[in-house]
Amino acid sequence: MMAVLLTSGCLVSSMIAADATNAVDKTATQLKRVGEGGKYAFVLFHRKGAEVASVRESVKKAVEDAKGRAEAIEVDVADTGSEATVRNFGVNRAPLPLVLAIAPNGAVTAGFPGKCEPQALADAMVGPKGASCLKTLQDGKVVLICVEPTGSASAEATAKAIAAFKADERISGFAESVVIDPADQAEQGFLGKLRVDPKSDGATTLLVTPPGRIVGTYTNAVTTEAMFADLARSMAGSTCGGGGGGCGPASGGCR
């Protein structure tokens, strides 16, 4: 499926597979080990003999700066021992070198073709809730992101509306929800990409469709009917429903 990857400066499209880390090859084994350790993987894909020294150095510096929260993995795309991973991530059709930032849950949080900077990789390390949102989208599902301060007056009503939306036969099995506390420091970078004010006293719910299009934005109260209306509008081609926008720093809303 086509997924929109969040980068520090732009949106990069890459073909990714939700089960890529389950492929039986040596890179998949490394990804599994790193993910189970709760770390990010910075994966450098390249062709043997290509000049990748500067990219390799950037990845090395990013790993050092992550202070135990990330590991580097290097993959020669011609290596048959990593063939499944290369195929599943669509790297055989991508410009090389390519660096992917992969969260512990397997979500690709950013992709950098050609070159990357250590800070860009650091920015790609979104928190667990942000990674969960991205994984849901990369699995081809709709995600409802509920940004709720502790003690939000609308939390109960919002939870009921979202539960009804997810249970509706029109979308059952194809929607997930993630609740994010705006005070959670680990999620500040992701909230910034969503353009949600973490200091707001009110709750904000975002309806996001693959690859990362925000098709509905709801402040405090939200209804199942409103969400389905915005979803239908986006499927009909009017992606400006509910405010439009995207879940990346370069998205400027409806274009």
Regions found by a protein language model. Give the residues of each.
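Bacterial N-terminal signal peptides
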Residues: 2-10
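Thioredoxin-like thiol-disulfide oxidoreductase module
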Residues: 28, 57-60, 64-108, 124-132, ...
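Sec/Tat signal peptide C-region and signal peptidase I cleavage site
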Residues: 10-17
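Short, well-ordered secondary-structure micro-motifs
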Residues: 156-157, 189-190, 218
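Structural motif
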Residues: 45-49, 77, 103, 113, ...
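Non-catalytic, surface beta->alpha helical segment in thiol-disulfide oxidoreductase systems
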Residues: 100-130, 209-241
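Local sequence-structure signature of Cys/Sec-based thiol-disulfide redox active-site neighborhoods
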Residues: 30-62, 136-169
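N-terminal leader/targeting and pre-domain segments
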Residues: 17-39, 115-140, 233-255
